[in-house]
């Protein structure tokens, strides 16, 4: 299966993207709003399918035990942030098959789980903005058109801890 953070499409009853993230976290892993300490929001990203994704960052209690909704997800696992700080764990692949320009995908392998694509980019941005850690690999290909660079790496809308 595909590895990702809890999330999904905004429903009519959701008042904001943040509300969507809270609802999806509750639906997928049983995380209740009272257990979430909002930290900030990463810049929006454009998925390969043209969906605008709004990543939120939160702290949750150490003792939280996920209640997996098997209709939504297959499994849930934890990865220590220190794993992503190790440059040997970070792989970069260059692709040419999607359109006329080359692009990069970022990859991590952790205990049989393949963490890649937008999920990997979100982690890279979190480490960059939250810890000041800069990856040895660039987030996007230098020859990618400007709109791809903007979609993958908005520097002007950096981590904003006051937006909910």
Predicted regions mapped to residue ranges:
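Unchanged
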Residues: 9-111, 115, 124-159
């Amino acid at each position: 299966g595909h590895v990702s953070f809890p999330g999904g499409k905004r429903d009519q009853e959701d008042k904001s993207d943040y509300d969507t993230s809270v609802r999806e976290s509750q639906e997928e892993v049983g995380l209740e709003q009272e257990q979430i300490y909002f930290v900030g929001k990463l810049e929006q990203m454009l998925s390969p399918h043209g969906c605008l994704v709004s990543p939120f960052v939160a702290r949750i209690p150490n003792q939280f035990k996920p209640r997996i909704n098997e209709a939504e997800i297959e499994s849930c696992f934890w990865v220590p942030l220190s794993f992503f700080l190790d440059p040997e764990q970070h792989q970069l692949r260059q692709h040419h098959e999607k359109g006329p320009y080359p692009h990069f995908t970022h990859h991590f392998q952790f205990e049989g789980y393949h963490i890649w694509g937008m999920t990997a980019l979100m982690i890279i941005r979190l480490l960059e903005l939250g810890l000041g850690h800069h990856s040895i690999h660039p987030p996007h290909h230098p020859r990618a058109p400007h709109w791809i660079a903007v979609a993958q790496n908005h520097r002007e809308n950096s981590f904003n801890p006051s937006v909910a």
